[in-house]
Regions:
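Mid-domain alpha/beta scaffold segments of enzyme catalytic cores
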Residues: 1-278
Length: 278
């Protein structure tokens, strides 16, 4: 069984064919997917998707948060709404944390001060509710590490990690797993491949970030966009980089995700279709 710890099933690219996208993932034995919200307004849509497709993907879960790319238009009222949404979601076993949150210092037209304000406010919520976080860390690893050290956050996932080995070690020390996916399928991705090969295996989780971060074969095979059904193929590439068999790798990254997201682990432990791994 495979796990995708970061997939935007609510993206517009999937809207006209979501049922077939989910079915394809199920056929490829993807049994758990994490769907992170990117805006406070997404709360109901991600919750409904996680519930609607739970028979097909029994480990389908969601997180709530405001992505840094949407911080320019975020108001104080959105943060208040997010707190209300998190409070209400605590009774839902498919709600597993706060995310996608973080900082993005690559996109030039984002106000860094606004980003930082929204990010710190969401870290405060994660600390208040003692929930793990799903982090967006593009060119912002050091700033995020500094913020995390000031808070008592119960770990989480640094999604699409592409930092240094030293930064990776610091995230791990703070209780985080590191997400890797399609970027590692490119031969030129030497730093990412080194991280996958040399980091402790217990620190790694798998993700697609679908429909984004296309794997290397996407264009050559005339595929429109990334999707969760590609998780096994991507993960097999990661296992090959690591030098271990895919069965061992699949089992290990599943346990890693469950370890860092205990509400996800509890959901899977209650499901007879998933209990043998969780």
């Amino acid at each position: 069984m495979w796990i995708d710890t970061h997939c935007h099933l609510d993206a517009p690219e999937f809207s006209s064919s979501l049922a077939s996208i989910i079915s394809a993932a199920k056929d490829k034995n993807v049994r758990a997917i994490l769907l992170p919200a990117v805006k406070a307004a997404d709360s109901e849509s991600v919750r409904m998707l996680a519930s609607q497709y739970s028979n097909e993907i029994p480990g389908l879960v969601y997180t709530l948060g405001i992505h840094p790319l949407y911080t320019n238009q975020t108001q104080e009222s959105d943060l208040n709404l997010l707190e209300e949404q998190i409070t209400g979601a605590l009774v839902d076993p498919r709600f597993v944390g706060v995310g996608e949150i973080g900082l993005d210092y690559f996109v030039e037209d984002l106000d860094p001060h606004q980003q930082e304000y929204i990010f710190h406010a969401q870290l405060e919520l994660a600390e208040q509710f003692q929930l793990p976080v799903i982090l967006h860390v593009r060119r912002s690893q050091d700033a995020i590490l500094k913020a995390l050290r000031r808070r008592n956050i119960p770990g989480g996932i640094a999604h699409a990690f592409n930092g240094s080995f030293q930064q990776a070690e610091q995230f791990i020390e703070l209780g985080f797993k590191l997400g890797f996916g399609g970027a590692a399928t490119y031969e030129r991705a030497l730093q990412i491949r080194r991280l996958i090969k040399e980091l402790p295996l217990e620190s790694i989780v798998t993700e697609t970030d679908a429909p984004d971060i296309p794997p290397a074969w996407l264009r050559s095979e005339n595929l429109a966009f990334n999707e969760p059904a590609f998780m096994p193929r991507i993960a097999r590439g990661l296992a090959a980089i690591r030098g271990i068999n895919e069965s061992e790798f699949a089992s290990r990254v599943w346990r890693n995700a469950m370890q860092v997201l205990p509400r996800w682990s509890a959901l899977c432990a209650d499901n007879p279709n998933l209990i043998q791994i969780s």
